[in-house]
Amino acid sequence: GSIPCGESCVWIPCISSVVGCACKNKVCYKN
C-alpha cells in the first residue's frame, strides 16, 4: 500500500497484481 507500481487502475484492474500490487485511489500500490 505505500510503493507506487507505476500503473493506474481507473478503467482496468492492476496487471501488476501478479507481483503483489493492489488498487488504491485509482493507482496500483505494493504493500
Swiss-Prot record:
<comment type="function">
    <text>Probably participates in a plant defense mechanism.</text>
</comment>
<dbReference type="Pfam" id="PF03784">
    <property type="entry name" value="Cyclotide"/>
</dbReference>
<comment type="similarity">
    <text>Belongs to the cyclotide family. Bracelet subfamily.</text>
</comment>
<keyword id="KW-1015">Disulfide bond</keyword>
<dbReference type="InterPro" id="IPR005535">
    <property type="entry name" value="Cyclotide"/>
</dbReference>
<feature type="disulfide bond">
    <location>
        <begin position="9"/>
        <end position="23"/>
    </location>
</feature>
<dbReference type="InterPro" id="IPR012323">
    <property type="entry name" value="Cyclotide_bracelet_CS"/>
</dbReference>
<feature type="disulfide bond">
    <location>
        <begin position="5"/>
        <end position="21"/>
    </location>
</feature>
<feature type="disulfide bond">
    <location>
        <begin position="14"/>
        <end position="28"/>
    </location>
</feature>
<dbReference type="GO" id="GO:0006952">
    <property type="term" value="P:defense response"/>
</dbReference>
<dbReference type="InterPro" id="IPR036146">
    <property type="entry name" value="Cyclotide_sf"/>
</dbReference>
<keyword id="KW-0611">Plant defense</keyword>
<protein>
    <recommendedName>
        <fullName>Cyclotide mden-K</fullName>
    </recommendedName>
</protein>
<feature type="cross-link" description="Cyclopeptide (Gly-Asn)">
    <location>
        <begin position="1"/>
        <end position="31"/>
    </location>
</feature>
